Regions:
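Alpha-helical structural signal in soluble globular domains
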Residues: 60, 64-69, 93, 97, ...
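A general structural signal for well-ordered alpha-helical segments in protein cores
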Residues: 26, 58, 62, 87, ...
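C-terminal alpha-helical cap/extension of soluble enzyme domains
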Residues: 3-14, 32, 36-38, 93, ...
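Active-site beta->alpha loop and helix N-cap motifs at the rims of alpha/beta catalytic domains
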Residues: 2-9, 13-142
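Catalytic alpha/beta core domains of metabolic enzymes, predominantly
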Residues: 126, 140-246
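Alpha-helix N-capping/helix-start residues
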Residues: 17, 23, 55, 147, ...
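Glycine-rich phosphate-binding "P-loop"
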Residues: 136, 158-159, 269-270
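Secondary-structure boundary/capping positions in well-ordered alpha/beta enzyme cores
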Residues: 72-73, 131, 160, 182, ...
């Protein structure tokens, strides 16, 4: 099964200055995304700062998103943490809320073997009756899930998709070559959204979409339709800005940008903190430049 095609936003979680969740603003961000044709909402992932949330709060944030979206687009909920038993408990609790799928990251800090990854994901997949998106992000976890491991896991009935945040199109091609259509691939790196879709991907799980949701939707739409010139035109138009979004650790820059476009105050939970003033200025200037351009 395909959960969605196109642009899924890895949505930020807005906080008040005291660190509590700003649910009113969160609802407004969800409405902004849907109004701009975002194809799916990914909540409580890396960009949503789920690693700073206790389980009960993460569940509450996910429940709020599911209730607010009310079936208009798919909601994928982050449920992976760095040990298997905890991931199972959290996944089962989130399953009760009715998300369309779970996003499960490879264990971080606790590095294991490829066989350990297989057993970890199979144990989680066996514990729930929901589609699971594997999430491979070695820049945050310190470990790459190998294409052969993804092939093995694709045989499980509940493991239906793969978020590729390795940042190397050669890895994506290796996965595609091995796995074929057994599992859907989503880009986890906005700077190669179009190449991954042209390599057979179904779309993106995007940080960029927090700031430019319509453009990200169109970028994916054109790539899926094989309107290559239009797709690459948008990929290249936003490329410098995408790189700025990762000039400091995500989601620090993107939350600043969400503030700059007037959608949310910029508050974090430590150890996340405000970007350097020089980067804040560059982000503001680039947003102004992009907004001054004609077209999509």
């Amino acid at each position: 099964m395909t959960i969605y095609t196109g642009s899924g936003v890895a949505i930020v979680t807005p906080f008040f200055e005291d660190g509590s969740v700003d649910y009113d603003t969160f609802g407004e961000l969800i409405e902004f995304q849907i109004s701009e044709e975002t194809d799916a909402i990914i909540v409580a992932g890396t960009t949503g700062e789920s690693s700073t949330m206790p389980d009960d709060e993460q569940v509450a944030v996910i429940k709020f998103a599911i209730d607010r979206v009310a079936g208009r687009v798919p909601v994928i909920a982050g449920s992976g943490v760095n040990d298997t038993a905890h991931s199972i408990r959290l996944s089962k609790e989130i399953e009760k809320l009715g998300p369309d799928a779970l996003l499960v990251v490879t264990p971080y800090y606790i590095k294991t073997s490829q066989q350990g990854l297989i057993e970890h994901f199979e144990a989680i997949a066996n514990s729930v009756d929901l589609p699971i998106v594997l999430y491979n992000v070695p820049g945050r976890t310190g470990q790459v899930m190998a294409p052969e491991t993804i092939l093995h896991l694709s045989q499980h009935k509940n493991i239906v998709a793969y978020k590729d945040a390795v940042g190397d199109i050669a890895h994506t091609l290796a996965v595609r070559n091995l796995v074929g259509d057994k599992i859907d691939i989503y880009s986890g790196n906005d700077d190669i959204n179009v190449p991954i879709i042209l390599a057979g991907g179904k779309g993106t799980i995007s940080v960029l979409a927090n700031v430019y949701p319509k453009a990200t939707h169109l970028m994916c739409k054109y790539a899926l339709e094989r309107q290559v010139d239009k797709a690459f035109g948008l990929q290249l138009k936003y490329l410098d800005f995408i790189h700025m979004l990762f000039a400091e650790p995500n989601p620090m820059p993107v939350k600043k940008c969400v503030e700059l476009i007037g959608k949310s105050a910029c508050h974090y939970r430590l150890p996340m903190t405000h970007v350097a003033p020089t980067l804040a200025t560059r982000l503001e200037q680039e947003i102004a430049r992009l907004n001054s351009l004609q077209g999509e």
